[in-house]
Amino acid sequence: MTGTAPLPRVAVVGAGAAGTLTAVQLLRQADRRGVRCVVELLDPAPLPGRGAAYRTTDPRHLLNVPAGRMSALPEDPEHFTRWLTARAGGTYRPGDFVPRALYGRYLGELLAGTAQRYRAARLVHHHDRVVDLAAGPARQVLRFASGAHRGVDAAVLALGPLPPAPAWVPAGLRADARFVRDPWAAGALERVPEHGDVLLVGTGLTMADVAVAVDRAGRTVHALSRTGLLPERHRPDPLPPVDPPVLDGPGDLAGLRRAVLHHLATTRRRCGDWRPALDGLRPVTAALWGRLSPADRARFLRDGLRAWEVHRHRLAPETAARLDALRAAGRLTVRAGEVLDAAPADGGLRVRLTGGRELRVATVIDCTGAPLDPRTVPDPLLGALLARGAARPGPGGAGLDTSSDGRLLPAGGRPGAPLWTLGAARRGNLLESTAVPEIRCQAADVAAAVLRSLPGRERPVPTPRRSAVDHAIAPGAPR
């Protein structure tokens, strides 16, 4: 009797946006190539597609990118807007900024519909956390928080932004129950008392969402960061991107900065707005970043990143208007400064800031966002990979170092194990690697590379079945 060889197994570690998009691409491309395999989505979360970004249920938490740019499929830019019309009710325009919860639902439905329609690969969702991965030349052994082990032929780390590891937190605050380390952890904002002022450390996009969520009558929300800079805002009617001129001057940071500023100024003179110029840089950002020397990259990450981010990653117009209203009413203050110390006082916290200022607050919430350096976070999987030399930090210490197709580079520098990553983990190599327009393209590239690496298992596959969800959002479907 001849036994049937087991199907190759691909692990996707993480079921947020990056992991879900990768699983979708693996299922679609495996079907197109006739590759039989098992795709294992590994994450303790009950539903795929949500992750830290899209698990919020607050309808005031909006996407920071217009709906027309948020399709999950690179080849079908209207896919998300068709889904909104077909599945979310109401009428949506490409320029609308919709609730993030809707996008999480969209990703979940897309994955379910893809698994139903494309049958060459089989999707399995294991609700467990991967805490270690022993990478070999042909087989990866995963260890889970539950103690279980599993062997796979290839793995994709879709870990999302690094967990908070704020270096700014003084000793008197670190273990205090009134300090919220991660505002997106389950139930974190529910711990904020109904009364008393609140200090938010960080003035970026996270702060904007948290300020709206914790606002109460009679409360002042204080937002603090070293620069005091708030993100710029999108226009309600975004203009199309303006392509930059050929930026082939000196490959140093100073020369590139001059060229980019000239592009912004020229675009502003021509159309009255700098935003289209910055949006036009999106397709070439990774190439420009790759031209810089290691020293210039490190210098930019240290000195220039914040100014770039406040212009590049902008607020939805509605969110910006809410912040304006809170500031005008005296319910939100924004200032530059740093936390020096904190101590319990009168049932709350007395927080000492630079400049001799003190605040009395009920809660302090870290809104500084994800750190860049994986060596600074207490993540068991990342710690194991780095300690074992199966991975190394990316340029400037940001993320993990990868080859051009997202394959992890070990300490020795030559890709060996069939182990890939995408999204936030590639910031050191690409700079811009956290938004869906970048991640969806990376997911397609990673899926293609993974499938090419699998042991030959091409067999006849069932004819794709068209699911009800897929039909409802097909091009040309009734609106």
Name each region found by the language model.
Residues 2-45, 52, 90-250, 254, ...:
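Flavin (primarily FAD) cofactor-binding/catalytic cores of flavoenzymes
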Residues 45-89:
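Redox-cofactor-proximal catalytic regions of oxidoreductases
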Residues 458:
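Short, charged, surface-exposed loops that flank catalytic or proteolytic processing sites
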